[in-house]
């Protein structure tokens, strides 16, 4: 996918890719006091130099402008980016430090150094009054740290969110204001599993595509949030993998609100392209991390192309970029082969070993190349036993039992952090895949989100 943006017939910028947001400064090209025509030209063809394309992929990407587009009005000097993270003392004490990495931009004509005041306030979401936690005089980008007493932690059962208000002031005037939703929590994968706020949690999740019948990707905020509601409240999982690309901010925001953990990853499926392609994939890592790193639900960055082979130089770079932009989260990389080169923090593996009669999963030691590192199963079942919602009952029961068997086996393996079943619902695909009708019947629900018997397992 490629987008070219024109203002009054003049190209002012563009973007490659279809899964993360982008912005273009058009202020210097505007006709002040006159009508302006803003045009976006979208090329939705499968460009071989842009991930996930380059070879066949097992899902449809559709096309068009399927998420929001808007004009953002700003002062010449504004808050360009705010990255929030926290330090929480061990023992889950109620006091924490809020760390803010703030980027200030000046789109004006002067390079004159100016001094600004950054002021931060916080309130628990749903309450009325903000409390100021600190302020600091700055002349440029700044990393600030302010104490926040008596915080409530974000967790699965009580996902407390705070609104952090950051104000940029000069001579007592507010130039810009940003309100960011944030959750205080610790999340870490260790050798023996995943820990949230110091407590071990076995991840029990499903993979989700963002497609719908008839409309492809083009569903509004309400439907994105509804999928998160289905995962948490109807299916009963505690985690979701956004296969195989970053998904709508509305979906992830709802995961924040529900206490649903998210493993998100860059676009791709098995294929690694040339140097131009790889450069775009690295840009995809940058965009993904910068746009989703304030979400407490996000616990793992997927920095490998799903089920691709080893490419150490390439994946050293994707891993480096993710850690540089967000040192607070670990990285993973989904592979379909054992004893792979492990450059990330977590060995994530698609385990399709279960055939309905054998043990539900492989031992960690049989798969990972470093048994001292965390291990996570990123896919299972799916194409091993395609099942329609109207298949005969015995077939649907066996489909459900395959999910039971894997979940039971993973629960018995103390050193496996958890697993993500393939997948939440059936989806459209290319002609090379599916059941001859361009549909993959791999879900525990059909594509209309009606449950099959396997949905009850979760």
PLM feature spans:
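Accessory beta-strand-rich segments of carbohydrate-active enzymes
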Residues: 1-81, 107, 237-238, 249, ...
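A structural microfeature
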Residues: 11-13, 131-134, 176, 198, ...
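Short, compositionally biased P/S/T/A/G/V-rich stretches that sit at domain boundaries
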Residues: 70-91, 446-458
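N-terminal carbohydrate-binding accessory modules
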Residues: 82-83, 153, 165-233, 253
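Substrate-binding/catalytic cleft of secreted carbohydrate-active enzymes
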Residues: 227-233, 239-458
């Amino acid at each position: 996918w490629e987008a070219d943006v024109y203002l009054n017939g003049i190209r002012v910028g563009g973007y490659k890719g279809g899964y993360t947001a982008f912005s273009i400064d058009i202020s210097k090209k505007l006709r002040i006091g006159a009508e302006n025509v803003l045009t976006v030209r979208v090329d939705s063809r499968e460009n071989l130099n842009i991930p996930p394309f380059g070879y066949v992929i097992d899902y449809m990407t559709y096309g068009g402008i399927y998420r929001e587009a808007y004009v953002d009005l700003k002062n010449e000097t504004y808050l360009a980016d705010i990255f929030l993270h926290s330090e929480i003392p061990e023992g889950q004490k109620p006091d924490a430090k809020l760390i803010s990495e703030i980027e200030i931009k000046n789109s004006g004509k002067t390079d004159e150094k100016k001094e600004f005041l950054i002021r931060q306030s916080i309130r628990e979401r749903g309450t009325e009054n903000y409390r100021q936690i600190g302020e600091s005089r700055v002349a440029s980008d700044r990393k600030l740290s302010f104490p926040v007493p008596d915080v409530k932690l974000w967790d699965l059962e009580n996902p407390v969110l705070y609104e952090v208000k950051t104000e940029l002031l000069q001579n007592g005037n507010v130039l810009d204001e940003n309100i960011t939703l944030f959750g205080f929590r610790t999340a870490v994968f260790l050798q023996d599993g995943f820990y949230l706020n110091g407590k071990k949690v076995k991840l029990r999740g499903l993979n989700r595509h963002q497609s719908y019948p008839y409309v492809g990707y083009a569903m509004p905020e309400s439907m994105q949030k509804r999928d998160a509601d289905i995962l948490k409240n109807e299916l009963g999982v505690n985690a979701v993998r956004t296969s195989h690309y970053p998904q709508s901010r509305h979906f992830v925001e709802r995961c924040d609100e529900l206490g649903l953990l998210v493993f998100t990853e860059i676009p791709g499926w098995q294929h690694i392209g040339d140097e131009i392609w790889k450069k775009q994939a690295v840009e995809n890592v940058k965009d993904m991390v910068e746009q989703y790193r304030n979400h407490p639900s996000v616990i793992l960055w997927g920095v490998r192309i799903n089920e691709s082979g080893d490419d150490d130089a390439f994946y050293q770079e994707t891993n480096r970029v993710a850690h540089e932009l967000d040192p607070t989260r670990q990285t993973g990389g989904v592979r379909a082969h054992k004893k792979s080169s492990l450059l990330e923090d977590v060995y994530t593996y698609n385990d399709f070993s279960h055939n309905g009669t054998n043990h539900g999963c492989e031992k960690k030691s049989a798969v990972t190349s470093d048994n001292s590192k965390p291990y996570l199963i990123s896919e299972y079942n799916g194409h091993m036993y395609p099942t329609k919602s109207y298949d005969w009952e015995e077939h649907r029961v066996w489909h459900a039992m395959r999910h039971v068997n894997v979940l039971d086996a993973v629960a018995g393996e103390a050193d496996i952090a958890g697993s993500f079943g393939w997948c939440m619902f059936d989806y459209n695909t290319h002609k090379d895949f599916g059941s001859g009708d361009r549909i993959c019947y791999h879900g525990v629900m059909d594509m209309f989100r009606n449950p099959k018997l396997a949905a009850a397992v979760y």
